[in-house]
């Protein structure tokens, strides 16, 4: 708990598929997926597990005709969040979204949409947060703000976070441990420092390139 695990790999290696399996959206062709020690494929387990799991992906669009506030209220109701109005106000304030609360999400910039997506993912205070390229295509300032918030959330709430990313600097800054994927398999794992030392490289990017090219 309270840790951020990086998931690195080239396009098509299975990062997004792995997240889909952890959400119970994709059935594995072999093996079993356990989340919080419970089999996610078991229908009786899945609903309970997903009450405390959430995710962010730039490939999932927000409902464009709903306002920021409406998005959060609808999502919060799906999770049965208690004291929902207070929670929505609190999280909009934390993510500097108050001034946009009555604006439709289709009218927002990419950075603003990402903050709304983050707010949605945190509305139920998840124990496990799955992030698929959460800062992709963002301006440096917005990306840095999102990274800082994710880092603080893990530390303060004790959440476990899985971060799939192509941004090596992001992974080095945030992650306690890194897993390297290739062709649907984990081919190496460890702390950033241990992986760099093990493969005799100067930084994580060089280490990653060496591993995936072998």
What are these language model-derived features?
Residues 31-42, 48-49:
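Conserved ABC transporter NBD signature motif
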Residues 73, 77-100:
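Conserved ABC ATPase "signature" region
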Residues 104-108:
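Conserved ABC ATPase signature
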Residues 125:
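Conserved catalytic motifs of ABC-family nucleotide-binding domains
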Residues 129-132:
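Catalytic Walker B motif of ABC-type/P-loop ATPase nucleotide-binding domains
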Residues 144-156:
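Helical segment within the ABC ATPase nucleotide-binding domain
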């Amino acid at each position: 708990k309270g840790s951020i695990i990086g998931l690195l790999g080239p396009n098509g290696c299975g990062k997004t598929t792995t997240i889909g399996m952890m959400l119970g959206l994709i059935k594995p062709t072999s093996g079993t997926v356990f989340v919080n020690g419970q089999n996610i494929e078991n229908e009786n387990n899945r609903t309970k597990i997903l009450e405390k799991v959430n995710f962010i992906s730039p490939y999932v669009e927000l409902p464009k005709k709903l306002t920021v506030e409406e998005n959060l209220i609808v999502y919060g109701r799906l999770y049965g969040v208690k004291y929902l109005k207070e929670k929505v106000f609190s999280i909009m304030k934390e993510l500097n979204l108050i001034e946009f609360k009555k604006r439709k999400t289709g009218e927002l910039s990419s950075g603003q949409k990402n903050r709304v997506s983050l707010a949605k993912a945190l509305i139920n205070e998840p124990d496990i947060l799955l992030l698929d390229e959460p800062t992709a295509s963002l301006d440096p300032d917005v990306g840095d703000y999102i990274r800082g918030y994710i880092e603080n959330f893990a530390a303060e709430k004790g959440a476990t976070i899985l971060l799939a990313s192509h941004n090596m600097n992001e992974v080095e800054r945030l992650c306690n441990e890194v897993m390297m994927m290739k062709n649907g398999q984990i081919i190496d794992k460890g702390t950033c420092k241990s992986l760099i030392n093990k493969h005799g490289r100067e930084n994580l990017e060089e280490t990653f390139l060496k591993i995936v090219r072998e």
